[in-house]
């Protein structure tokens, strides 16, 4: 994950991350100080959620509600990437006083294998288009065996862990794996995993 703008990321296995990308306007930012500040914010959040006083996920351990994956301070840009145990954790962490990420207004986000999303009745006739915006028939979508489906409500830039195959007509394709989600209504993105 190397985003050029703030986004929410859904991996091929459905795991959730977010990236906070901010322009510094040429102001120098100390990477170590930023990392320390963000680690403290993550630890505080995790403690409030009843998890350990940790800032990073540990191997072979349960995922923390929030984890700081990486921090990078460049000449003009700072980037922080966070991992989450659930969408509820992503949303709650975004609402803390320690988090300056206002890049998304998501109120719901769920990811699951396409076969499960179809079985659960996520899609109705005419809701989906191919990545390029052309019409996608329901049969075409149902024949896609290896896809991952994302359903969301609220605005955001959504980056996914594979090539976008289908999307709601109310979304905008930004590149092969990035979609702009609308502020209102339910949006769907199906990507190859």
Predicted feature residues:
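N-terminal Sec/ER secretory leader and immediately downstream segment
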Residues: 1-66
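Mature, soluble, non-transmembrane domains
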Residues: 61-193
């Amino acid at each position: 994950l190397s985003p050029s703008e703030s986004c929410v990321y859904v991996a091929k296995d459905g795991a959730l991350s977010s990236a906070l990308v901010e322009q510094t306007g040429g102001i120098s930012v100390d990477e170590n100080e930023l990392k320390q500040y963000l680690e403290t914010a993550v630890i505080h959040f995790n403690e409030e959620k009843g998890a350990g006083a940790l800032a990073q996920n540990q191997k072979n351990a349960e995922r923390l509600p929030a984890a700081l994956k990486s921090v990078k301070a460049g000449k003009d840009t700072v980037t922080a990437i966070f991992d989450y145990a659930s969408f509820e954790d992503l949303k709650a962490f975004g609402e803390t006083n320690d988090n300056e990420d206002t890049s998304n207004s998501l109120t719901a986000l769920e990811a699951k294998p396409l076969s499960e999303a179809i079985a659960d009745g996520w899609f109705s006739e005419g809701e989906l288009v191919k990545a390029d915006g052309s019409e996608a028939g329901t049969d075409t979508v149902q024949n896609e065996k290896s896809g991952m489906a994302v359903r969301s409500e609220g605005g955001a830039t959504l980056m996914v862990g594979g090539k976008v195959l289908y999307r709601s007509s109310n979304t905008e394709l930004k590149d092969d794996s990035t979609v702009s989600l609308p502020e209102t209504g339910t949006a769907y993105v199906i990507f190859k995993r």
